[in-house]
Amino acid sequence: MKESVQRKLESLTERFEEVQALVSQPEIIADQDKYRALTKEYSQLEGVVKCFADYQGAQGDFESAQEMMQESDPEMREMAQEEYKSSKQAIEQYEDELQILLLPKDPNDESNCFIEIRAGAGGDEAAIFAGDLFRMYSRYAEARRWKVEVVTMNEGDHGGYKEVIANIIGDGAYGVLKFESGGHRVQRVPETESQGRIHTSACTVVVMPEVPESEAIEVNKADLKIDTFRASGAGGQHVNKTDSAIRITHVPSGIVVECQDERSQHKNRAKAMAVLQSRLNKLEEEKRQAEETSTRRNLVASGDRSERIRTYNFPQGRVTDHRINLTLYRLDDVVAGDLDAVLEPIRQEHQADLLASLSDEG
């Protein structure tokens, strides 16, 4: 292990012990903001500090085994040989784990997120596909015990959605789903297709971290145009009799957000403002990324429709992720919400890219 890495791990261990002592102090417990910040720091440090302690234990075993191998007793030497092998293997394993644990973290990874799905080329079929994608993400969220709250939905004429925006609430939701931003393409035979021809349709998905109020971008009220309108209900049921739906336009950026999910205008306005904050935050992030000179590829796409990230081919039961050339013949499972089969290889590739960029810098 490099000396610089060893020093960093020792310093993190010291800080962990310091935080551990602080969180048990009555004056810290009484100050909720400080206590929350310290418990968050504690949980962020815990994994890497435990892994470093295991690494040090294996290092100690390795050194003991080396000493024992000098013994005159053949039985002791044989035992030492076994210990030498297993501790060397453990050291290598912990070094790999520590490398990943020390990778720079995206500060938004632990956040809730907003997911926007929009039907693109393909008319009714694209809207039906947007409905399939929304169900896929909802089932995935449900399996992880995350909560899904619809912000707004614009239903398609023959099922699905022209657009749907949902808030996904749960630890690490953004960190897991951020790789879903981009163009999603479907190839299948529509139910209305009598000739059995395969049609291609597309949707765009944008995943944005929810911005905590404390970090919200200051928005000048004069820059906002707010319209109210009557919410539309499916098939005339539960149609809102008041103008409770909200449309907020941020004039300088041209961003428009609608929310008509709640019956209360006040709640719809709060939800729309939260989405607006996330979109403004995303704009800022994209500007920052554009200014960076790094040539490292970015597996977290912006959600631009031209960035096709994945194809779902129903006749072949195939899912292809174009960013990492991954092909799986498990389409039904993936669409049913078993997204980890796709997300895990992407996450690993992302980690490998980060490791490679750190090696280049080093």
UniProtKB/Swiss-Prot annotation:
Compartment(s): Cytoplasm
N5-methylglutamine found at: 237
Skewed-composition ranges (Basic and acidic residues): 284-295
PTM annotation: Methylated by PrmC. Methylation increases the termination efficiency of RF1.
A GO CC annotation given for this chain: cytoplasm
One GO molecular-function entry: translation release factor activity, codon specific
Region Disordered: start-end pairs: 284-304
Keyword Cytoplasm in record: yes
Assigned keywords, A-Z: Cytoplasm, Methylation, Protein biosynthesis
Pfam families, A to Z: PCRF (PF03462), RF-1 (PF00472)
Chief location of this protein within or outside the cell: cytoplasm
The keyword Protein biosynthesis is annotated on this UniProt entry: yes
Protein family per UniProt: Belongs to the prokaryotic/mitochondrial release factor family.
Function noted in UniProt: Peptide chain release factor 1 directs the termination of translation in response to the peptide chain termination codons UAG and UAA.
Name the record gives this protein: Peptide chain release factor 1
Lineage, top ranks: Bacteria, Pseudomonadati, Pseudomonadota, Gammaproteobacteria, Alteromonadales
